[in-house]
Amino acid sequence: MIEGDVISVCKPALGARIFNIWTALKGEEVDVYRLSGFSKVRRDDILVFNFPYSEWNQWDENMKMNISNYYVKRCVAVPGDTLFIHDGIYMIGDGNVLAGNIESQKRIMKFNPDNIPDDQYYTLPFDSIVRWNIREFGPFYIPGKNDSIPMNRTNYLLYKKIIVWEQGEEVLFQDEKVYLGNKELDGYRFKSNYYFMSGDNSMNSVDSRFWGLIPEDFIVGKATLVITSRSRDTGKIRWNRVFKRIE
């Protein structure tokens, strides 16, 4: 997809969402109920979802469903996957499964890291010890509903915002222990499914490498078709893109 595309989104595929839109527009948390769909999210699906923060560049705050801001990205990892990036290439599990736009990912290795600004090179969890970046990242387990993880410093850094969003309480790391409110956490069981989203232009995409995983509740549906496309520069319709299938 390119700028100027107008796309159709298939909501019944995953099941349409039902929630109080007026409450969501006020910036308040809402319960989301999803109708039964006829398919699940799969790797390489192009998804439309609500951005997980109130502002584009404020992903140091707590997660929330931004009902006014929609993103379109490729899903490269689903619940149960372990994702890692080596030499810029997205890999699943033991590395036998590649994910995303590989040709775009290969171009990352052509750039000298010294010439890339830190805020574009280093990724979550933005930690001086867990020093992940756009070339070397992970392993990062993508949790599903009822999956459990042990709580340690690394998992605290990786999953803190998810836990806060699910529980509505702050999570702290103190004296080598993790606390949810005043309660010590030895482990955590997730309440939802999560997905890793990536832009096809890997070098210039702001995606799950930076702002983290997307809860299933935030997903609107699958992008399926370019209905029409108009150049912002000329105002003319790009007829070669009209009714083009999104892949």
Question: Which residues does each predicted region cover?
Answer:
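Soluble "head" domains of membrane/secretory-pathway proteins
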Residues: 2-247
